[in-house]
Amino acid sequence: MFTINAEVRAVQGKGASRRLRAANKFPAIIYGGEAAPVAIEMDQDKVWNQQTKEGFYTEVLTIVIDGKEEKVKVQAVQRHPFKPKLSHVDFVRA
């Protein structure tokens, strides 16, 4: 079971996303189900280390946002063209 911490994004847009990436974080979103979509930010190093493990893309993940757990699966991943970094991840509620 994978557990990842995240924070709700206060500011959205291209400039805010670039500032996140410069701070070694990246934007992501959780959508699906009855609840509204949630824009989040995640730590680059922690998620990169998790995504190299075998079941990251197939198993149900737990994302902890402000103490509340969300069960999700990875829907789409955008990676940097040549750096070992994630640009954006879409999660769908499980």
Swiss-Prot record:
Q: Which InterPro entries match?
A: Rbsml_bL25/Gln-tRNA_synth_N, Ribosomal_bL25/Gln-tRNA_synth, Ribosomal_bL25_short, Ribosomal_L25_dom, Ribosomal_uL5_bac-type
Q: Quote the Gene3D superfamilies the UniProt record gives.
A: Ribosomal Protein L25, Chain P (2.40.240.10)
Q: Which domain of life is it from?
A: Bacteria
Q: Name one GO cellular component term.
A: cytosolic large ribosomal subunit
Q: Which UniProt keywords apply?
A: Ribonucleoprotein, Ribosomal protein, RNA-binding, rRNA-binding
The annotated subunit structure for this chain is: Part of the 50S ribosomal subunit; part of the 5S rRNA/L5/L18/L25 subcomplex. Contacts the 5S rRNA. Binds to the 5S rRNA independently of L5 and L18.
State the protein's purpose.
This is one of the proteins that binds to the 5S RNA in the ribosome where it forms part of the central protuberance.
Stored HAMAP family: Ribosomal_bL25
PANTHER family attached here?
A: RIBOSOMAL PROTEIN L25/GLN-TRNA SYNTHETASE, ANTI-CODON-BINDING DOMAIN-CONTAINING PROTEIN, RIBOSOMAL PROTEIN L25_GLN-TRNA SYNTHETASE, ANTI-CODON-BINDING DOMAIN-CONTAINING PROTEIN
Q: What is this protein called?
A: Large ribosomal subunit protein bL25
**Organism source for this protein?**
Enterobacter sp. (strain 638)
